């Protein structure tokens, strides 16, 4: 399993990388924030990996209902998966404190999220110099993340979900408008990042869009995509459709389907 640290070291060398744990995912007794601050002050760039985990720690038992029960005196870093439900989308433990402390050093701050569910990213979207959502990236994920961070691979992924600003917005559907089109008292009603959102190190230009109706139920869509930036890259072209009129099935009295 390649961690993000492993991937970064392969790009540089162990002598050029200073690692500090900082904090745990959930356990607030793990506190190396001051050590992380000192390391950040000695560094040119700060890369912080935060988020969650669904890795079984084998200290957790499960009830017949599937609910997770941690051993007394231990705090599992697992916060996602079967039996692990969340009441908020915030970073757990001291992770938010770690981010804010490192940002105050004034060094360029890159935040990498490892997550199994969309976590709240309001602070990072405003204060971080770069933000990368990697979800659970797999066995070679550390190398893949390092490739993106060091510019050896141009990211082209697009969000498969909408990222909410607050747990109060859930559910956030890309294909369903809110029943009332106005903002909340505290935040905008729009998602922080919409379904299909993503960034690239280059830019693309679309032109010559044509939609040709081949038959009553068949349309052909064509267009040109040009890379107008300085770097090679891949583009995910997205096409969204909706019915102008939708047929409804009217049930008879006492029918359920």
Name the predicted role of every residue range.
Residues 253-257:
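A short, hydrophobic C-terminal helix/tail in secreted or cell-surface proteins
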Residues 1-252:
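C-terminal non-catalytic regions of proteins with extracellular/luminal or membrane-system context
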């Amino acid at each position: 399993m390649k961690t993000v640290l492993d991937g970064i070291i392969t790009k540089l060398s162990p002598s050029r990388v200073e690692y500090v744990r900082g904090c745990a995912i959930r356990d607030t007794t793990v506190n190396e924030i001051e050590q992380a601050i000192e390391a950040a002050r000695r560094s040119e760039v700060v890369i912080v990996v935060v988020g969650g985990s669904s890795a079984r720690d084998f200290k957790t038992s499960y009830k017949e209902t599937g609910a997770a029960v941690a051993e007394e005196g231990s705090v599992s870093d697992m916060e996602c998966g079967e039996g692990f439900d969340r009441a908020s989308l915030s970073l757990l433990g001291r992770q938010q404190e770690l981010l804010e402390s490192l940002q105050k050093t004034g060094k360029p701050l890159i935040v990498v999220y490892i997550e199994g569910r969309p976590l709240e990213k309001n602070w990072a979207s405003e204060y971080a110099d770069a933000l990368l959502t990697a979800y659970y990236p797999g066995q070679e994920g550390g190398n893949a993340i390092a490739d993106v961070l060091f510019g050896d691979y141009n990211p082209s992924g697009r969000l498969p979900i909408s990222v909410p600003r607050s747990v109060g917005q859930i559910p956030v559907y890309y294909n369903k408008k809110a029943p009332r089109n106005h903002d909340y008292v505290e935040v905008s009603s729009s998602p922080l990042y919409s379904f299909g959102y993503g960034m690239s190190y280059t830019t693309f230009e679309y032109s010559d869009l044509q939609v040709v109706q081949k038959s009553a139920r068949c349309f052909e869509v064509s267009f040109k995509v040009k890379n107008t930036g300085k770097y090679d890259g891949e583009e995910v072209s997205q096409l969204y459709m909706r019915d102008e009129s939708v047929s409804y099935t009217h049930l008879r009295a006492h029918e359920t389907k």
